[in-house]
């Protein structure tokens, strides 16, 4: 093995790249690369990549891969990446396109070498979530100690290393934006070695982790916001590439886009997004940071139309802006929030944008107006407001001289004495503030004083730079209490910041990546929460618990944490009108008199607690469900307990008895009695398999509830099982 690592490639590859600058035609470029490969291949000694340890953990494969045995005869692209890095994410579309063009049968294999920056990124489950979230379909190895990184003397994320069929290093590409070279180098390398008979077409045993993922209502939700009334939520269902608008009980009102990624304006049924993140709602208009499309989208809930208001659909490199929105290239917008211009006459006439891809904060003028230290701007203009574009933790009285590092969350505090934007600056692990009087950028908590040190992270409660965060992605301002809540994503916590005292403390979460809805905030767990918002009245905080695929609810008054059930209106009828609910139940089939009535043990529960009833019914042998009949479950309560039913999902279809039917129920946050009884009923129609006889059967389960303060917020599951027998 050559000891010099990637440095051994530098002299020859530098000469090649200078020569490519002078080449006029594609043929000239191909010839130059071909001659370079002849030179590299005839070296007395290969620059050979070291073998990976067999103890390393792999994803998307049937087992560990040997670079020198399993990949002998392959052209290999090693992608040294860490999943927090926006530049690494920008590279993924190029790799997707490359592996679509060339498969392992063609002789090409891409290997992701995950070399973590943050401690949380060394954990295999965290990498699994990232592989799923970003649709990575090539093998990934968890090089948690960055052994290969150090052996090759890699210096930054991302770095690509192209290997020949002997594990011989041929090229390296540092940073993003080298698509043309990547495709040129790869295609000529494949051609060069195929001519020499050194390329093998064997399969390497890909086994995609995403194929084992069970379906869920949400997939890696990135952000959530709530309207001023507190009645509607907007959820960026990022992994499903869609936006959901729900009632506060989780009933879906609108599904916009999904389930596949795309880029299309139009009606809700045809619109398409690509990994949307930040959302902001005012009245019946929603703005969306359509992150991987590099767009800002506008959703009109009345017209049910999606339009593009900023971005051109490809990643921009412009760090100034100033063009009209739909003509202005932008880069990986991660969050959006409404604000006010200095001279505007309308409220919420500016949309602030966390432009993570170029480490800046931008503004989209929704009306004509003026920004701090700026000139008058026309409606529709999109431009940089703060940040030089250099990735750093630099505070400055002049907004254009300040530096951010992947700003990912924004929240507005418009009242005095704040009048600022709070920024969750993820890669510097800080919370910053931008004055809306003069644009000055100041530090609040986290990080350290050296603006170039982006490794000052940790999990420490404290004040100012003594507090430590780890890659915070979300932030929301509680104007009632004058406090700031932060999604400290890689610490799996929600933290609270007092901006007056610059103090930061843990509000919820243990620091363990898990999914426990515990008896208190600090006994509950999250898994990389990416966004959060607070009701206008300051009571409920909604958290996008990203890797748990859930929305969690923190009640700041009762200190109860619960999970928000996502209720699909196609399979579940929900209304706040009890008379309507009673009519719906009245129209459902009546259970036959022979239907058993099963008394369940009393269940201790707390206001706001979520209960999942897991219904599993078994038909007699040689019977089958009559799928044309109205097979259904429904929930009822005695007349003196009807307060339990308001806003609940009271009925739904039973389509398949081979698996459990999940029936969600959430106790009201205000309970009128300490004791109550729910009845969960089911009605099935089934026939003998020879269709000689069909029948209707029913079952009722009575669930007594003891409502108190025990098990506060805990998700409780109750199994309801019954086997029908032939009379």
UniProtKB/Swiss-Prot annotation:
SUPFAM superfamilies: NHL repeat, Thioredoxin-like. Gene3D superfamilies: Glutaredoxin, TolB, C-terminal domain. It is found in: Cytoplasm, Cytosol. Keywords: Cytoplasm, Repeat. Pfam families: NHL, Thioredoxin_8. InterPro entries: 6-blade_b-propeller_TolB-like (IPR011042), NHL2_NHL_rpt_dom (IPR045302), NHL_repeat (IPR001258), Thioredoxin-like_fold (IPR012336), Thioredoxin-like_sf (IPR036249), Thioredoxin_domain (IPR013766). NHL repeats lie at residues 207-249, 260-302, 330-364, 404-434, 456-500, 513-557. PANTHER family: NHL REPEAT-CONTAINING PROTEIN 2 (PTHR46388:SF2). Monomer. Required for normal embryonic development. This is NHL repeat-containing protein 2. It comes from Gallus gallus. The lineage of its organism: Eukaryota, Metazoa, Chordata, Craniata, Vertebrata.
């Amino acid at each position: 093995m050559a000891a010099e690592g990637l440095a051994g490639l530098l002299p020859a590859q530098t000469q090649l790249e200078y020569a490519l600058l002078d080449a006029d035609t594609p043929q000239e470029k191909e010839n130059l690369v071909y001659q370079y490969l002849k030179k590299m291949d005839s070296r007395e000694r290969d620059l050979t990549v070291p073998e990976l340890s067999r103890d390393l953990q792999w994803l998307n494969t049937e087992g560990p891969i040997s670079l020198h045995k399993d990949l002998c005869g392959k052209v290999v692209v090693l992608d040294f990446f860490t999943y927090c890095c926006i530049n690494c994410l920008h590279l993924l579309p190029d790799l997707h396109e490359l592996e679509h063009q060339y498969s392992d049968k063609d002789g090409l294999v891409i290997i992701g070498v995950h070399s973590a920056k943050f401690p949380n990124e060394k954990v295999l489950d965290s990498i699994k979530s990232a592989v799923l979230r970003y649709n990575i379909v090539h093998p990934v190895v968890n090089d948690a100690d960055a052994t290969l990184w150090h052996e090759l003397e890699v210096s930054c994320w991302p770095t690509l290393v192209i290997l020949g069929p002997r594990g011989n290093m041929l090229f390296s590409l540092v940073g993003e934006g080298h698509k043309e070279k990547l495709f040129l180098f790869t295609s000529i390398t494949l051609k060069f070695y195929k001519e020499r008979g050194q390329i093998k077409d064997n399969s390497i045993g890909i086994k995609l982790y995403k194929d084992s993922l069970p379906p869920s209502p949400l997939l890696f939700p990135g952000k959530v916001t709530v309207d001023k009334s507190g009645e509607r939520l907007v959820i960026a269902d990022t992994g499903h590439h869609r936006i959901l608008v729900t009632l506060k009980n989780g009933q879906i009102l609108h599904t916009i886009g999904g389930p596949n990624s795309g880029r299309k304006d139009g009606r809700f049924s045809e619109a398409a997004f690509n990994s949307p993140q930040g959302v902001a709602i005012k009245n019946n208009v929603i703005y969306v940071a359509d992150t991987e499309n590099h767009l800002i989208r506008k959703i009109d809930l009345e017209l049910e139309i999606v339009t593009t208001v900023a971005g051109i659909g490809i990643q921009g490199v412009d760090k100034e802006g100033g063009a009209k929105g739909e003509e202005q290239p932008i880069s990986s917008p991660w969050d959006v929030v409404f604000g006010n211009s200095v001279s505007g006459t309308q409220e919420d006439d500016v949309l602030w944008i966390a432009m993570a891809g170029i480490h800046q904060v931008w503004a989209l003028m929704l009306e004509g107006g003026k920004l701090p230290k700026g000139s008058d701007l026309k409606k529709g203009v999109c431009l940089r407001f703060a940040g030089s574009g250099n990735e750093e933790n630099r505070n400055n009285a002049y907004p254009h001289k300040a530096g951010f590092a992947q700003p990912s969350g924004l929240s507005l505090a418009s009242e005095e004495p704040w009048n600022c934007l709070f920024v969750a600056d993820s890669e510097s692990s800080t919370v910053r503030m931008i004055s809306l009087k003069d644009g000055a950028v100041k530090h609040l908590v986290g990080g350290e004083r050296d603006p170039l040190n982006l490794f000052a992270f940790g999990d420490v409660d404290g004040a100012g730079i003594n507090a430590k965060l780890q890659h915070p992605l979300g932030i929301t301002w509680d104007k009632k209490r004058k406090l700031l809540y932060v999604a400290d994503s890689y610490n799996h916590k929600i933290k609270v910041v007092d901006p007056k005292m610059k103090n930061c403390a843990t509000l919820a979460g243990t620091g363990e990546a898990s999914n426990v809805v515990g008896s208190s905030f600090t006994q509950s767990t999250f898994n990389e929460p990416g966004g959060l918002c607070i009701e206008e009245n300051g009571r409920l905080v909604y958290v996008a618990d990203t890797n748990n695929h859930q929305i969690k609810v923190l009640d700041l008054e009762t200190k109860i944490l619960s999970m928000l059930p996502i209720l699909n209106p196609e399979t579940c009828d929900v209304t706040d009108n009890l008379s309507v609910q009673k009519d719906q139940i009245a129209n459902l089939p009546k259970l036959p008199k022979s239907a058993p009535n099963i008394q369940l043990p009393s269940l201790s529960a707390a206001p706001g607690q979520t209960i999942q009833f897991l219904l599993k019914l078994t038909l007699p042998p040689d019977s089958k469900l009559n799928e044309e009949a109205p097979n259904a479950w429904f929930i009822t309560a005695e007349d003196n307990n009807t307060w339990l039913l308001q806003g609940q999902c009271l009925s739904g279809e039973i389509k398949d008895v081979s698996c459990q039917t999940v029936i969600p129920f959430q106790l009201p946050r205000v309970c009128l009695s300490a004791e109550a009884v729910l009845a969960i009923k089911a009605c099935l129609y089934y026939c003998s398999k020879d269709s000689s006889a069909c029948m209707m059967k029913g079952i009722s389960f009575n669930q007594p509830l003891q409502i108190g303060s025990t098990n506060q917020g805990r998700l409780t599951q109750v199994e309801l099982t019954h086997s029908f027998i032939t009379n």
